[in-house]
């Protein structure tokens, strides 16, 4: 709506908004500020949750800006849990049959949620239900998201558990790295993926540039990316268009990007990523 509001009548309509909610994927504060300019009378919220349990947490733009001053590289702050919801950060263990151990404040792990309004289960999908609701009671829901709780009790989302890059130096989450590069370069979309075996994966940064050729980035761009983040970067690549979920334009298909990046680094024939499926 905001992107298409080019006429005076549409802009006046947006000016009458009182509350705006944006959810479904990590929302950059820059995006919220742009919407705020079009709807100056609205309070902007980014509630966090999922189909199985919503809401889990909530935050408005003013609180996001305060959180980002405290930690500009923490990921996406989605606020404190709403009344009645409990959030736990647990070890990432895809094979756990019981609730994984809880981690200390500030530690990155999988986000687990308990609330009276969590859905009852999954109809006929027993393996999914066992994985999502571990333990004999099954009252904790494994979100599949990763993040951390800070000292103020705020929840930060850092990406998906399946997208964590397991390097020899430790795990690297996708969202904080991508946001740091996007801000430094002033670009709309970046993908951080891992190439190689789990435990010794190499971090590869793929920058979306409509004018670039799919393949290795130029030396200046690569240097700018490496200056933007503290993690060692094995390679910087560019693509004309990053592949996204057919239903959600904000959700990059990192599995496809990682496979393509592996081919590039292995010296195989570089194909157009947007047509790679």
What is the predicted role of each segment?
Residues 165, 189-194, 204-205, 222-277:
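Conserved C-terminal "lid"/linker of ANL adenylate-forming enzymes
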Residues 86-96, 145, 241-247:
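Active-site and channel-lining beta-strand-loop segments
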Residues 40, 83, 185-186:
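Proline-centered flexible-loop/turn and helix-kink motifs
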Residues 144-146, 180-210, 234-235:
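C-terminal boundary motif of the adenylate-forming
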Residues 212-221:
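Short, conserved charged micro-motifs
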Residues 6-73, 86:
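Gly/Ser/Thr-rich phosphate-binding loop
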Residues 102-174, 183:
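Conserved ATP-binding/catalytic segment of the ANL
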Residues 26, 47, 57-61, 65-126:
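Adenylate-forming AMP-binding core of the ANL superfamily, especially NRPS adenylation
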């Amino acid at each position: 709506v905001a992107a298409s509001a080019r006429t005076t009548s549409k802009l006046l309509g947006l000016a009458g908004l009182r509350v705006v909610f944006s959810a479904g994927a990590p929302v950059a504060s820059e995006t919220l500020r742009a919407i705020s300019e079009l709807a100056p009378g609205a309070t902007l919220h980014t509630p966090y949750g999922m189909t199985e349990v919503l809401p889990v947490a909530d935050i408005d733009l003013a609180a996001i800006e305060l959180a980002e001053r405290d930690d500009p590289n923490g990921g996406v702050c989605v606020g404190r849990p709403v009344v009645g919801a409990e959030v736990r950060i647990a070890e990432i263990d895809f094979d756990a049959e019981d609730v994984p151990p809880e981690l200390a404040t500030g530690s990155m792990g999988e986000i687990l949620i308990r609330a009276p309004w969590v859905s009852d289960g999954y109809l006929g999908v027993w393996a999914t239900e066992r994985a999502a609701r571990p333990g004999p009671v099954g009252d904790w829901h494994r979100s599949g998201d990763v993040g951390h709780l800070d000292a103020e009790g705020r929840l930060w989302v850092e990406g998906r558990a399946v997208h964590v890059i397991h390097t020899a130096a430790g795990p690297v989450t996708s969202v904080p790295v991508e946001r740091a590069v996007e801000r430094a370069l002033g670009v709309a979309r970046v993908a951080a993926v891992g190439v190689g075996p789990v435990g010794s994966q190499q971090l590869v940064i793929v920058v979306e540039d409509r004018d670039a050729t799919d393949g290795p980035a130029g030396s200046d761009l690569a240097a700018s990316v490496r200056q933007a983040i503290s993690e060692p970067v094995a390679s910087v690549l560019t693509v004309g268009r990053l592949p996204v979920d057919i239903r959600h334009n904000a959700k990059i298909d990192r599995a496809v990007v990682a496979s393509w990046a592996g081919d590039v680094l292995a010296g195989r024939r570089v194909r157009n990523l947007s047509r790679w499926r």
